[in-house]
Each structure stands twice: as C-alpha cells, then as structure tokens.
C-alpha cells in the first residue's frame, strides 16, 4: 500500500475538532458493481447509503495518497464522519500552481506540497505544524496596509468576509426528514399493516407522518431564515491600500488589511487587533456581559506571541459593537484584520449552531432491531 502517512493523516491536532483524514479516488469497477447491486435490490440499498455516506464512498472509491485524492473521508474524535470533495482549481495569474483544497463545516483546508498535508486556512497566523504563530510586533509592521495585488491574492485564498447561512429548499428538507430512521420505521410498519389488510391503521399513520414532517420542515426553514437574517451583516469600511485610505465593502476585507475605525458606533465585521487608539466595546453578543469593555493597542513586543485568549483586551471580535473610539495623539484608530468569515469568533458560534455534535440515540439502534425482527416475522408468516 505504500507509505501509510501518504494515505491518511491528522489535521487540527490537539484541538477539539481534531480529525483523521483519508484519501480516495473514483473506481469505475466499484461504481458499476454498486449500481448493479442497487438495481437488483430495487433501490432499497439507497437508504443505507444515504444514512452512511462513508459506505457509499468506500463502495465507489479506492484508497489513495492524499495528494491524488478526489474525495476525503474525515473522522472526528467524537466518531463523526464527513465526506468532502477535493477541489482541483485551475491556475491563474494571481495564484499560479494552486494546490488542491476542500471545505469542511465552512472551513477551507488546502494541500501544502512542501509538508505533504492538508492544513486549515484560518487567518494571519501560520497554521503549519511547528509554527510558533505571530509575534505581537508583527502587527505594527503591517500598519501601512496591503497592496491591491496582495489583497486580491488573499481574497482568492481566504474567500469573501461573509457568514452566509444557506436556507435549504423545501424538497431537500423533506427528503432529509423522511429518510431518517424513525420515518423509515413508520414506512415499514405501514407496509406490514397494508399486507395484513389493516388499512385504517396504515392511513392514520401516513396522515400523522405527513403532518409531523410538514411541521418539522416548516419549523426548520423558519429557524434557518431567522439565523440567516441574524448573522448577515455588511458595511462600508475605510481601509488602507497602498498607503491610501479607500472605502471598501466589509465583504472584501482580508487578513492583513488595516481598517480605520470611526468615532461613532460601528459593528465589527471581522476579528482585528488594535494597534492605535482606544475603543469602548459592547461584547454582549458573544459573552452576554452587558458592561462595556475598553480595548487598548497590543504591545509592540517581539518576544510575545499573539493569542486571542491571552490578548483579549487588544482584540476586536467580529459581531461586537464599538460604542466609541478615541484616537491617540494625531493617529487614527487602526486595527489589523486577523480573521474573516467563518474563522472569526462570530463565525465559530454560527458553525456550532449549524454543525452541532451528533448524539448517538439508543432509540435508533432499537428501531433497527425492531425492523429486523419484524422482517423475520413477516417472512415466517408469508412462508
């Protein structure tokens, strides 16, 4: 099989979202064989494949080195599994020799050839293994802002600074709901009752299931729309580009940009590190604490490594409201953009809502056992 590490690896090591990653490539032979089995089974195998995407992946793909993978299988420390498609981009003038990448739970992971592994694109901090992060004085070296070409390159690398919540179409919500173990069990019970000529019971179960699915889909869609409206935000920000002040949409902010904060109230659209002036900030959206907090510039100390946890007083978090900013001497209130989009503190909260930790319900296991027992009884009864 070759070097095992080239076929699998670990990402986000030491973090709560640490995952083991496996590489897979499409196998024509396996795919044809699976489709033949699907036809012979009358399509019943589709349910199993939708419940467990990793099974479909293994039945249609072969294990391969991560560098050559078309899809990747991710296994978390909480026994969750995700199947993601690896995107192989075409080269451009700004991004020649682009490496492959994929998205998992709204986060981008890119292949780094020099270390032969995928790593998370999170912001200014270098996330490669062995990196010691950014020293605090580095933020002052960025005080003049980015060049337009550099900003455009980073925009293609990091993506737009937006937190977009998709509202799924109704038909997708219905399919996701009815393919769940509970409704499959209900369907199985209805079929058995129809076979035994208990039509009244079967019709009642069907009607109740339709009402239940409709109510669930309506509530899910309502909550998705409410979340989308709550997190969507955009404003016009003054940014330093090529040493000049220009007005840009907050969606165009990239890590390394220098933003100039106004004196009046404004909502932060990114995580940023304050390098000049003071700010009074309302962080109730993140912490629930109603008392305003004063933010001060980060120290210009090369021996200190920046950490959002340690340097909270120097960090302006996305989603928080700046009530008032006060310039120092003749300088404007400036901050260096540290993280954007779903990598921000606000983005992490939204991701926790969109992708909660899965719960292994004992009820589902019991449902499968019940279906198996009923299948045996029906088979015995028919014979």
Model-derived segments and spans:
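Extended, hydrophilic extramembrane loops/domains of integral membrane proteins
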Residues: 2-9, 141-162, 325-357
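Membrane-cytosol interface motif
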Residues: 64-77, 231-246
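Cytosolic catalytic regions of P-type ion-transporting ATPases
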Residues: 97-115, 119-135, 235-365
